[in-house]
Every structure is written in C-alpha cells, then in structure tokens.
Amino acid sequence: MTMKRKSARRGSSMLEFTLVGIPIIFLLISTFELARGMWNYHTLAYAVKEGTRYASVHGVNCTASPNTCGVTIAQITQRILDAGIGLPSNQLSLRFTDAGGTTNCLANNCLTNNTVWPPAPGNAVGNNIQIDGNLPFQSVISMFWPGSGSGTTFGTFNFPASSRETVKF
C-alpha cells in the first residue's frame, strides 16, 4: 500500500507576506517620497528662474516715461508662485539682490510688497540681478517608519534655488 506523500514545500502566506510585502511597500512609499522631494526641488528652481527672467526685462527703460512696465516685488513673487505650482507660499523664502542691496521676505509677505524692483540704480541695462529661493522640505515617510510613534520625525531639508540675469531693457 502506498501513501500519497504531501508536498514537502509548505509555507505560511501570512509569514511570507510579512517578510516580503512590508519591505516592498516601504520601498514604494520611499520612492514616491523621493520623487515628491525632487519635484519640489525642480519646481522651485524653475519658478525662481522664471521670476528672474521676468524681472530682467523690466529694468530702467520700463520705469522711464512714457513706459509704465516697471514691476514690483509683489508682481515678481506672484510670477514665481504661478510658475511654481504646489510651492507653499507660507514656507518659501525669497531674497531679491541687485546692485543697490538685498530684500528678504517670505512669499506671503512679498505679495504685499509694492516696492519697484530692481530699484534705481540697480535697474540699469547690463546690471546683474539675482533672486534666491529657499524651501524647507520635510518628508512624511516617518508616518510609515516601522515602530515609530508620534514623536518620530525626520529632519527638514532646505532646497535652495538661485538665478542670476542681467537687466536687458
């Protein structure tokens, strides 16, 4: 009499999922977080570049009569925020630098600054202007970190962006 032999390969699907599935899920979430961080970094760089380009073509000749195309810090900031879809204006800090000096503000506060920029004499054709942006980024991956409680947080990374142009008009 022969007995049917059970398969020698037995396993527990719950245990196998725990050992393989959870690290895979964590890897996927980590990949999305890295992509979100790089998206913010690239968007910030693009937005600051667009703001600097916009300011560089609104120089001294825009403020001379009969032209009325001079721009303010508020208008440049709005241009940066329009180009930077998803950038939080309450965290984005901007620094406007020209030959005459530097202006620092959070994007929310910059939106109410009606100072013409770049001001004379820094708005002369050929002068350099620069806009710097800084965006703090904190990953939400700590929510998914195994064994973490409510007190576990990861550090904040500052994403810098800088753009320099010469005044063209």
Where are these regions (language model features)?
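Alpha-helical assembly-interface signal, strongest on the long, hydrophobic N-terminal helix that forms
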Residues: 2-81
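Low-complexity, S/T/G/P-rich flexible repeat/linker segments used as non-globular hinges
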Residues: 62, 139-169
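A generic structural signal for short, solvent-exposed coil/turn residues
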Residues: 36, 86-88, 123, 153-157
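A generic fold-level signal
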Residues: 9, 124-126, 158
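Surface-exposed loop/turn and secondary-structure junction residues enriched for glycine/proline
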Residues: 20, 41-42, 57, 90, ...
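Intrinsic disorder/low-complexity segments enriched in polar/small residues
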Residues: 5-7, 131, 166
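Short amphipathic secondary-structure patches
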Residues: 52-132
